[in-house]
């Protein structure tokens, strides 16, 4: 490969990476806004979050097409090929996170259209959502900086999100048993909590792809301890 073509190839890869980070920024804002409207009940903001999901979907298609063109034209190998595969996997998870954020916005809209005055377990929901957003932010940062030390931290945070989710479920069940009038709103919040738990799972996936990108090893379905040992080798 000539130096000129190599520079073009590097520029194409960098452009794709930049689009992934742009997509990640939109998705991160979606989640933050979706949790906010649970409290505020701003219907217009709910609609904007749902509209942003269309932009995320369009970006996924655009980046996917860019990756297909790069593979066809450049026939990348080794770490360059792993970069393209990592991008394709990452945008799939980002698109699914966007779907979950839009789902939360729709549930918030439903709750406030029914004039629900108190959102059950809102403080816990906000706390766990902040952990999930932090996971997403760290995963995107690891991708941007090729930081192999981050994924194990994200996996540990995912374990925390899973535990928080279980706690919220237990509290909601107790809440519904004590006051059956809260069943409808509590079920909506249960689905919000589940959406946040899934966001954490997708963010964890994204961090694990960074290890694959740098070391060429698949570290899905391993514990944080195993992952730490893997990246130290």
Residue ranges: model-predicted function:
Residues 1-233:
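Cytosolic, long alpha-helical scaffolding segments
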């Amino acid at each position: 490969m000539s130096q000129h073509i190599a520079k073009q190839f590097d520029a194409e890869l960098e452009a794709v990476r930049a689009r992934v980070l742009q997509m990640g920024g939109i998705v991160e804002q979606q989640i933050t806004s979706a949790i906010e409207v649970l409290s505020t009940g701003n219907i217009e903001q709910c609609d904007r979050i749902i509209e942003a999901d269309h932009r995320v979907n369009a970006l996924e298609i655009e980046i996917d097409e860019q990756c297909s063109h790069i593979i066809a034209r450049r026939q990348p190998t080794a770490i360059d090929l792993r970069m393209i595969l990592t991008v394709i996997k990452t945008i799939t998870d980002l698109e699914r996170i966007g779907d979950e954020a839009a789902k939360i916005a729709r549930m918030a809209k439903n709750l406030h259209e029914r004039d629900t005055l108190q959102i059950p377990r809102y403080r816990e929901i906000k706390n766990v959502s902040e952990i999930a957003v932090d996971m997403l932010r760290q995963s995107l940062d690891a991708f941007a900086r090729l930081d192999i030390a981050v994924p194990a931290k994200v996996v540990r945070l995912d374990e925390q999100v899973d535990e928080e989710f279980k706690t919220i479920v237990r509290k909601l069940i107790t809440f519904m048993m004590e006051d059956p009038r809260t069943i409808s709103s509590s079920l909506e919040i249960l689905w919000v909590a589940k959406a946040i738990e899934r966001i954490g799972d997708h963010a964890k996936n994204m961090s694990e792809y960074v290890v694959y990108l740098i070391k060429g090893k698949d570290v899905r379905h391993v514990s944080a301890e195993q992952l730490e040992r893997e990246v130290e080798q």
